[in-house]
Regions:
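N-terminal Sec-pathway targeting helices
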Residues: 1-16
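Active-site-adjacent substrate/metal-binding segments within catalytic domains
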Residues: 28-119
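Aromatic-lined substrate-binding rim segments of carbohydrate-active enzymes
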Residues: 81-153, 158-159, 238-254, 336, ...
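Active-site groove signature of glycoside hydrolases
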Residues: 134-139, 143-146, 157-229, 250-262
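Glycoside hydrolase catalytic-domain groove-lining segments
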Residues: 256, 278-377
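Aromatic-rich peripheral "rim/lid" segments of glycoside hydrolase catalytic domains that contact
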Residues: 371-380, 386-389, 400-476, 710-727
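Short, well-ordered beta-strand segments enriched in hydrophobic/aromatic residues
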Residues: 465, 492-501, 637-645
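Surface-exposed, glycine/proline- and aromatic-rich loop segments on solvent-exposed faces
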Residues: 476-597, 655-684
Length: 727
């Protein structure tokens, strides 16, 4: 018996050791060293072809990028389960998409769901699988030849190959990579790999300067030309190792590409543009060539948005062709009124430059209420676009992509992601908590076609003029004339119901003073002459459909606290407003648009966008007149209104944290807790002080509620992609 137990134990240990060697280290023995690899996908000139029914057929990428975010979770939680993926895959294919792009190895639930969804399906979904590069590695002292960059990228790339072939187990992983048992072979639906992230230009430049002699690579599958830079030689090695590994272990090949974007695009712009935008590096995959052992092919992958960086808007149109080094026809890149479509022109430059297929693997616009950048020519902005406008912009972008001669593109992104951050709101929020609330001011959270709206099945309020969801329990303060203010809130908005008998909307001006912090505020408004029962930090002014806005006391203006030098040229910390200053200001966001500064670098301040200006409309997604950017609506004697938390200087409503006084010992934005705010209702011209009532606030911590909703943009893109115009 003892011998039997020992034998069984030994066998189990051997099996475990074999499992670890094969599924965790990538070890293999090439049993068919002379076998030629096969491929079902290849490039032919600037097109991609798939082999179907024994014939090569042209394939155009109609793709969607998919992230890992869910409300209440960070990207690194990998919280999306198999059933959710299956539901999403069906919705994506019903929209007319044929490809999903992911950025890194996801949890095993994704691959199990992908396998199950495609099984027996005549028209499957295809996958573009990515390999991520750690953000710290790209933004540190390391160069691209550091083992933590180059070798780690190689290791992750080979691991990715095992994952899609169902031959890997990952129990402990980096935070940018999922884990699990990867036992499903989905390789028959993986058309290609996209290696890397958006390259940091300083890392590329640093690598090239540090290793000028390492600008050549000669491999079995890839080699560099004489014009290659060291960073490109590093990429060639990574790609060569990928092709060699998959060809030897699995006798297969598929397409490959390296991530790129405008910041490191291959063009040499005029000196003034290069200097102004500090463009210090290029990555050109034309310097990486394939040997005759490559049966699949290489494509050029770009993240390209209409508004970023939009270099061509600063280059004279007569010089556009010179960037490609050949004559390029841009005649269809001008509107009838002469306005250039610099996005289409840029895409045309890319296809003119490259000899391989060009795939725009990221393009999109955001439905967030906030904005970070305006598109100068086409109006496809980074933020503050309605869901309908988003859909129209996506269709226009895809048309530009195809008319420029690209092999397709992938929309960014499938779902909204609450954990995301944006450079022009990062100063205003607690970035350790943004996964637990929906910040409508942060545009980066709202690029998705799928929204996660607050509430388990529906939101607590829809601003549409129907006040049936309001009750007496919501009343904060009421007045002798029957007027009242009621409030609710959820993970995205503070909602207000303003009731006033005999309301003459648009003919009288209503004012709501709001007191959020005891550190600042004023009981008197210099501009209106109104007096308040408490020191108000904000003033909500309702003048009608076109001229209603939220104002902030100048001392509590978050833009000034972080960007006054950029916008006004003044340092307000040297001479801050008084704590009880009676001045109220409009609320603005700083933008990245550079036109004014580029034209007159010495005199122009940064451009801003009035985010406190309120938009009238119906915010109920169930209604035909739905406007996702609508802030308020009037019906009879009632006004319904919603304000995003950050607009009222909440840094983390999940724990009810707001901004402290910027100037009293903080020298910047710090956070303090609050348990209530005060609100009142008055009108321009009244002489008596406006009484204010208290409204209790209680955070929800890490427990969030949300429900999925397909945006209007989904329907618009679906009609385009399935209606015969999606190519």
């Amino acid at each position: 018996m003892k011998r039997f137990v020992l034998s069984v134990t030994a066998i189990l240990l051997i099996l475990l050791a074999l499992f670890a060697v094969i599924f965790q280290t990538g070890f293999y023995i090439d049993m068919t060293p002379n076998a030629l690899p096969t491929t079902f996908v290849r490039t032919q000139g600037q097109t991609i072809q798939l082999q179907k029914d024994g014939r090569w057929q042209e394939f155009t990428v109609r793709g969607v990028n998919m992230g890992t975010g869910l409300p209440g979770h960070w990207a690194t939680d990998y919280a999306i389960d198999k059933q959710t993926y299956l539901r999403w895959f069906a919705q994506i294919q019903e929209m007319g998409a044929n490809t999903i792009r992911v950025y890194s190895i996801l949890s095993d639930d994704f691959y199990n769901a992908f396998y199950e969804y495609n099984q027996g399906r005549e028209e499957p979904l295809y996958l573009l699988q990515g390999v991520w590069v750690n953000d710290y590695v790209q933004n540190s002292h390391m160069d691209a030849f550091d083992d933590r960059f180059r070798q780690k990228l190689i290791d992750d790339t080979l691991m990715m190959v095992d994952v899609i072939h169902g031959q890997r187990a990952i129990f402990v992983s980096d935070d940018y990579m999922g884990s699990g048992l990867y036992l499903r072979d989905i390789s028959q639906w993986v058309i290609g790999y996209i290696l890397g992230a958006e390259w940091e230009d300083v890392t590329v430049a640093y690598t090239n300067e540090k290793y000028p002699d390492r600008n050549s690579y000669q491999g079995e599958y890839l080699y560099t030309t004489g014009d290659a830079a060291p960073f490109e030689a590093m990429l060639a090695e990574v790609g060569d190792r990928l092709l060699a590994y998959e060809s030897a272990r699995y006798n297969e090949q598929r397409l490959f590409a390296f991530t790129n974007w405008e910041t490191t695009d291959p063009f040499s712009y005029p000196e003034e543009v290069t200097r102004f935008f500090r463009k210090c590096a290029t990555v050109d995959v034309e310097h990486i060539r394939t040997t005759d052992r490559v049966l699949s092919g290489q494509f050029a992958s770009y993240h390209a948005y209409p508004y970023y960086q939009d270099f061509l808007s600063y280059v004279d149109r007569s010089q556009w062709s010179a960037l490609a080094g050949k004559e390029v026809d841009f005649s269809d890149c001008l509107a009838a009124d002469g306005t250039p479509n610099s996005y289409r022109a840029y895409l045309r430059l890319l296809t003119a430059h490259h000899t391989m297929p060009v795939v725009i693997s990221e393009f999109g616009v955001s439905t967030g209420r906030g904005m970070a950048q305006r598109d100068q020519n086409t109006g496809r902005n980074q933020g503050h676009m309605s869901e309908s406008e988003q859909g129209e912009a996506l269709v226009a972008c895809y048309e530009d992509i195809m008319d420029a001669g690209c092999a397709g593109g992938a929309v960014f992104s499938w779902q909204d992601e609450w954990f995301k951050r944006t450079w022009n709101t990062m100063h205003a929020i607690d970035m350790s908590r943004n996964a637990y609330w929906s910040d409508y001011q942060t545009n980066e959270q709202y690029f998705g076609l799928l929204s996660f709206d607050p509430g388990k099945e529906q939101s607590v309020c829809y601003v549409d003029g129907d006040v049936s969801e309001w009750s007496d329990a919501d009343t904060v303060i009421s007045y002798e004339d029957g007027s009242s203010v009621s409030m609710k809130y959820d993970e995205r908005f503070l909602y207000f119901r303003i009731h006033k008998p005999g309301l003459r909307f648009g003919q009288e001006t209503l004012v709501l003073p709001i007191d959020t912090t005891q550190k600042t505020g004023t009981t008197y408004s210099e501009g209106s002459g109104l007096r308040f029962g408490r020191a108000a930090d904000f003033l909500l002014v309702l003048r009608g459909r076109e001229d209603s806005r939220l104002l902030v006391q100048d001392r509590y203006n978050a833009l000034n606290a972080n960007y006054s030098q950029n916008v006004t040229g003044k340092d307000l910390y040297a001479d801050p407003p008084e704590k009880d200053s009676p001045r109220f200001e409009t609320i603005h966001m700083i933008l990245q648009t550079s036109t004014r500064v580029f034209r007159d670098e010495q005199q122009a301040g940064a451009e801003t966008f009035e985010t406190g200006l309120l938009r009238y409309g119906d915010a109920n997604p169930a209604h035909a007149a739905f406007d996702s950017l609508a802030d308020f609506c009037c019906a009879g004697e009632d006004i319904e209104l919603k304000l995003p938390w950050q607009l009222l200087n909440f840094a983390d409503p999940s724990r009810m944290k707001i901004h402290d006084d910027y100037y009293d010992g903080n020298y910047g934005i710090e956070f303090i807790p609050v348990s209530r705010l005060w609100v009142g209702l008055g009108s321009i011209g009244q002489t008596e002080r406006i009484p204010m009532g208290a409204y209790s606030l209680r955070g929800w911590g890490n427990t969030v509620t949300s429900h999925e909703r397909l945006k209007s943009s989904y329907t618009i893109l679906q009609a385009y992609w399935t209606g015969g115009d999606g190519r």
